[in-house]
Amino acid sequence: MLVTAYLSFVGLLASCLGLELSRCRARPPGRACSNPSFLQFQLDFYQVYFLALAADWLQAPYLYKLYQHYHFLEGQIAILYVCGLASTVLFGLVASSLVDWLGRKKSCVLFSLTYSLCCITKLSQDYFVLLVGRALGGLSTALLFSAFEAWYIHEHVERHDFPAEWIPATFARAAFWNHVLAVAAGVAAEAVASWIGLGPVAPFVAAIPLLALTGALALRNWGENYDRQRAFSKTCAGGLRCLLSDRRVLLLGVIQALFESVIFIFVFLWTPVLDPHGAPLGIVFSSFMAASLLGSSLYRIATSKRYHLQPMHLLSLAVLIVVFSLFMLTFSTSPGQENPVESFIAFLLIELACGLYFPSMSFLRRKVIPETEQAGVLNWFRVPLHLLACLGLLVLHDSDRKTGTRNMFSICSAVMVTTLLAVAGLFTVVRHDAELRVPSPTGEPYAPEL
């Protein structure tokens, strides 16, 4: 398993580098890329945001292993994960309103403080302290995915008066480097866990200086900005109306809730499936992230002028890949017949599918959901998503250890088949919708049906 993990990591990384280099050579330079003021503004944002992302990714490979190292049972670990998911959905519902009221810069500093406290709790073996740490982690995650982006958009448009059309370029580059940071974080986590002598808690300790630097740079380099948004109740009410009045939005919500709840369960299960067979967890995690990066690169190539596939096609492909992978896992995790290499390959395919899924879903959401209703609609999307993930973990909590993992993958397979039916329903609804097609090189919607 050790050799398989390292060979897979090297092969995936080489594939990603080759695709990205060829894409960069073929890409024409844009006006935004040569604007010194814009580049400096991007740099001020990236140096804070990337530190926050690096600290977040550094903790991911060893979270389950840490709880296992503290001799908690799988059911107890499942409850810790459920607590984290529940706090994420609760804080996620109010995060945007909190950030707008408190201030985006202060919210980013608050993120660095709460996430540092979350890491400190990992030094304790007390179950209640770890539960508190998971709650703090949920708050921190909600702030990470709301405060930083909100700060950037306000500064970009209101303070610097750059064209709004340049915003996607910033976040596209951020998405790419987010994958790169995730790959590097897995290698770093493996190194510190193996060499420092602290064991699985080492990556959490190593994340604290990064978080402190995140808060310090935000305090020093960023200006404060606020936004008076409409009331939280009105935001949710408007989002619910949009969700129920447009079948496309409803189907997108169903697909997101089902697909991403399965991914949350995968995040919980990969460590207990591979760790008993001597897998280097940090390198395995980096391989996962490299597979996801490869999927994102393939998405960009597939939707380019040369191939011109549509996001709807790639969303369907992503779901099909996950269905196939989960069927593989159902057999490769059978008690007494475990095949860790086959399970590892299935996990890599799931991550590859995620690399196709997330940009496809982002494109479709952006086209289908009105900008004024996106916050409210996404809040409604997140509730069933996290509830399904929590339910799955609770079912696993009550299962027999020997058969529980296999049974959970069987349930996830059924969920993904349902997701595939929802994708087919969405495909039927939007097949004549030119708005949901990537524009052709001539600027006209691509002629063939979705």
Swiss-Prot record:
One Pfam family per UniProt: MFS_5
UniProt GO MF annotations: molybdate ion transmembrane transporter activity
Subcellular location, principal: membrane
GO CC terms of this entry: plasma membrane
Membrane topology: Multi-pass membrane protein
Alphabetic keyword roster: Cell membrane, Ion transport, Membrane, Transmembrane, Transmembrane helix, Transport
SUPFAM superfamilies named in the record: MFS general substrate transporter (SSF103473)
Highest taxon in the source lineage: Eukaryota
Any GO BP: monoatomic ion transport
Transmembrane intervals: 1-21, 38-58, 79-99, 128-148, 167-187, 191-211, 249-269, 278-298, 311-331, 344-364, 376-396, 409-429
Location within or outside the cell: Cell membrane
The protein's role, per its UniProt record: Mediates high-affinity intracellular uptake of the rare oligo-element molybdenum.
Family of the protein in this entry: Belongs to the major facilitator superfamily.
Protein name: Molybdate-anion transporter
Organism ancestry: Eukaryota, Metazoa, Chordata, Craniata, Vertebrata
Gene: Mfsd5
